Amino acid sequence: MDYMALSAAEWQQEYDKVSAEYESWKAKGLKLNMARGKLSKQQLDLVSGILTALTSAEECVDSGVDARNYGELKGLESARKLFADILGCKTSQVFAGGNSSLQLMYDTVSKAYTHGLLHSEKPWCKEESVKWLCPSPGYDRHFKVTESFGFELITIPMTENGPDMDIVENLIKDPSVKGMWNVPKYSNPDGIIYSDETIERIAKMKPAAPDFLLMWDNAYCIHEFDGDFVPFKDILSECEKYGNADMVFEFASTSKVTLPGAGIACFACSEANMEYMTKLIGIQAISFDKMNQLRHVKFLQNKEHTLALMKEHAKILKPKFDMVVETLEREIKPLGIASWHTPKGGYFVSVNTAPGLAKRTLALAKEAGVVMTSAGATYPYGHDPLDSNIRVAPSLPPVEELEQAMAVFCCCLKLAALEKSKK
């Protein structure tokens, strides 16, 4: 049944049917949440061993460094090496910090704003205007960071291979364009992997701004839930190859590997950037939580062992993602009112409805007790120009709750589409 081709009588019959289904869902008083990519209790239980990874004072010493004490601003050598092995860069290029990669990202932009970067002519706060490129749909918290500094956010359409590089390459001719957000693997929310060609074009860019900042958030670098680990290019060496070693800062964390909010995070950059940034960071901090870094090193051990843990996460996640996609295929695909990308990793399914349906769909879902990411959140300033993108986060609810939530969501999308196409 194609909703766009219904006769008036067919529309009324379908509308009455879907409306009745919606009212029955509302009557159940559900309280379900698909708003954020949180880990389920089952996933958190996988890493309970990290709580007892350190049990004696002797175990707190790592390569001669007592993790209980001050010092080692750039993090424990072993933690830096673990991240370097995962990211494919050098240990000397890694700064291991606290629990939040978002905080490290904010701090990097903040330092550019207040002090300037290595190749800045002046702090960005003294620039007449600062513009920032935002591949969209993208991560709402990225956009909020750059919006909070008053930057002008420019939407860059996403393709199946990553951001539209023709548009990017044209825009960076403007010296006021200072940077770009990226989630290169299993992008949030589309689950797209940047192609090798896209990565090469990004690495070889020649922005007019000498201090252009490529923010490379590799949040889902080892987060496959369908199939084996997919290797990825080391953006640091790619940029260095094209004379852009100082252009990029890469970020990662264990937030969806161990404990969200109690993991460890890092940034990776050129040695020259490392020297510049550690001088600034050394004013605000003496060291980060090395005890937690050491707990993670003891628990995760190395890249191979970490990938084995991610396979255990995948066993929990895959049935949930399969169920979401199967429900969409069964309930929505025949109606011609939405499309989606089926990801093999990451934490989201991105649904693109027919124009003008996202806000209404999510308002109906909220009334029926299903909370989801706000409409528009995946675009700069919270404004989706087509009002069509909806981010589904399947990871937190148990499967039985997720089945209910998806049934409600599909019902709401149908109702919104029928309202829009009223005969």
Which residues are covered by each model-predicted region?
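Short amphipathic alpha-helices in soluble, non-transmembrane regions
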Residues: 361-367, 405-410
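N-terminal "arm"/small-domain region of PLP-dependent enzymes with the aminotransferase-like
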Residues: 2-74, 78-79, 84-85, 367-370
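Conserved core segment of the aminotransferase class I/II
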Residues: 237-318, 418
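Conserved core of the PLP fold type I
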Residues: 59, 65-210, 221-243, 358, ...
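Walker B catalytic acidic pair
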Residues: 218
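Conserved PLP-binding active-site segment of the aspartate aminotransferase-like
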Residues: 350-355, 372-414
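Conserved glycine-rich beta-strand-loop-beta hairpin in the small C-terminal domain of fold type I
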Residues: 311-325, 337-352
